[in-house]
């Protein structure tokens, strides 16, 4: 869920057109977003400037930075933001093809090797401090608590239940992405093994109850924990007991964004099936192959799902902004504190009518933070996030970005995907989204099984990687067997559970240990 910043602190809106329901709105010659309304500073920018909030102190090679998002004092408002500014903000993500990058994020469960119990916060703090000291990462603090690390354009952050997340740098090739993952896992293991800590690659916590999971000292999570039970029955499980792997990809124009968004939504259930890896809850099979995916169906319907409006003829940056304006907020960040704004909308904020901050107007930083609290199967920021896959072992951490890069970064392959899915109805897309977490590639679809569609899709992904010319096809080996057999990783785990594991989930902590 962490933000992956794909560029520096200044952003430009490319020349061209941003479509609008009311006609075509021209975004004139590279309007600088900084100049449009205010100084915009990315939450994860390396150029954070501060007053009191971003105290930086050198301790040897270490640099300590305050918690993200800590930038409201660095933002100088000149006049109020408008809806058009928010549209232009998304459009500022457009990049020419040679500047497209791959950003991979993954989460994992830390546990005590001797007891299999989840890591406590004090153990996580020790781990983070040791990684910072040994491998020269900057510490990220919230108050006096360490909550993450930064190094260049990479960051390590903590999910609400202590899940350990790497948000990778934007990289050019899958070889670089996989090397980044390997380097991260080496560093984490080097410290964790000395502490008797292991890390598990799964989509859902297989053994422990919700109340067994420690909570992290992050203000935004306190607000979310209080709000989640009001809007769904599984939101706290999403926060505390799930892990994902996702890839963040670029687009060249509004038209390119629309094509990738539609392809990503249509094929997201196939990614969910290929990477399904969460069949256990509290020590027993839970009836799902991807419990993590199912959990999102009863977390908060205001901010999740398959976004059928993306397939409307009128869809574009403007329509996504209108959607996001009406998704209830979680918080705003003011004076070093998270302000509870749950149930209120950014549309109210834009009008200066936010009950939690009466009379105040939003900054670009507020908008960026709000966009990170929306959780559809594909999410739009200034790049696109493919969000349908369970966490898994390291080979699958490299396979997930390979799958989507192959499908979305080659124009001919992308067109083939759009042709393949063009006549899928909203009801069919919703059916796949809801049934795949239970039946995986064996989900009936039209005249056959989803497995048969996945065979065609995997071939397209391989073709797309071949044509990139970087010898990246091998990264799909981890899912090739899944497609060939129609047997998901979760089904393999269930077979071991019912066989050699003697109906115990404990061996999974060794089987899927990083």
Curated annotation (Swiss-Prot):
Return the transit peptide range from the UniProt record.
Answer: 1-55
The transmembrane residues are none
Give start-end of the signal peptide.
none
Give compartment(s). Plastid, Chloroplast
Q: Write out the GO MF terms.
A: ATP binding; glutamate-cysteine ligase activity
Give the induction text: Up-regulated by cadmium and cu(2+).
The effect of residue 220 to K is: Reduces activity with cysteine as substrate
Q: Which reaction does it catalyse?
A: L-cysteine + L-glutamate + ATP = gamma-L-glutamyl-L-cysteine + ADP + phosphate + H(+)
Q: Which cysteines are joined by disulfide bonds?
A: 178-398, 341-356
Q: Provide the assembly information.
A: Homodimer or monomer when oxidized or reduced, respectively.
Biological function: Participates in the detoxification process.
Q: What is this protein called?
A: Glutamate--cysteine ligase, chloroplastic
Native source species: Brassica juncea
